[in-house]
Amino acid sequence: MSGSNDLRIAVLGVGMMGADHVARITERIKGATVAVVNDYFIEKAEQIAAGIPGCRVIGDPLDAIADPDVDAVVLATPGPTHEKQLLACLEHGKPVMCEKPLTTDVATSLEIVKREAELGKKLIQVGFMRRFDHEYEQLKTLIDDGTFGQVLLAHCVHRNPAVPPSFDSSMIVKDSLVHEVDVTRFLFDEEITSVHILRPAANPGAPEGLQDPQIALFSTESGRHVDVEVFVTTGVAYEVRTEIVAEKGSAFIGLDVGLVRKFGTGAGNGRSGAGMSGGEITPSFKERFGQAYDVEIQRWVNAARTGAETGNYIDGPGAWDGYAAAAVCAAGVQSLETGERVAVDMVDRSSIPGAEPAERPIGPGA
């Protein structure tokens, strides 16, 4: 949805996620336009650009970032390229929405945090979209307003029908469990201090060598515990659920929508015993979190357009959140390999001047 004062965005990487963002910005986001696209496969970039009036293809991602007619950047490129591209965004003062991961290791993620802090601006937002899902927002409000008293623990489920052949056991931690890492930090507003990955019996239907499912146990600064079942080869559908348990009750999100029937013996259902049938199952993350992605990008665009007034160009998880996720996942991979509980190794946030949390912008859509 374009206009003369739109935020001109370069989308780097137009695979499944990047192409989805291009369509989102072009069709539904207000105040922004896709001005440049870039991809390793130039033909793909040209195909997408051809459908957007005035959109150009720039072959080098660093040239796309530096282009004077680009105001902001969406990074949907492979994780190993993020460090160099994020540093270029910081160098040119360009707000950037970076799909996870921030970078592929803890040290470079911390370096990104420090480099941004030195600028005195919040330019990097990380794409943890669940924070923008209405059910997670409801759960967060319930926790923060004290309705159920002190929250004690959480149970999470994260299931996928299948993964690519290249997916290995560590990627279950780094690419899937990372979302529950951010959800835990978002809901409880504190850091995770240790991770223990348990290895149940492997799914016979999983690719050879893939340890799936996995059970993750988190401990937080205040002593809360979170357990997560991650199962990425169910062969069924996409399922994400979270339950919090507190001193005065519990709350549960993630049930699929649709008619569910419970019936007893002789209910005319053609079965001999009691049971349950019906309901709909979400096929993939795009259907489950499509609205959350729209809200995420709209709020980022709003913040990026007004950031010059405050130095805060983001409205959501920032570079520190990306670093924290990397640190927890590194501990998770170590635990997967050793079978032991592993402490999360992070620097003290207060030791980095300028790395404090950004205040949420006030304005349309905020």
Swiss-Prot record:
Catalytic reaction list: myo-inositol + NAD(+) = scyllo-inosose + NADH + H(+)
PANTHER family recorded: INOSITOL 2-DEHYDROGENASE, PTHR43593
Quaternary structure and partners: Homotetramer.
UniProt function note: Involved in the oxidation of myo-inositol (MI) to 2-keto-myo-inositol (2KMI or 2-inosose).
HAMAP family named in the record: IolG
Family: Belongs to the Gfo/Idh/MocA family.
Protein name per its UniProtKB record: Inositol 2-dehydrogenase
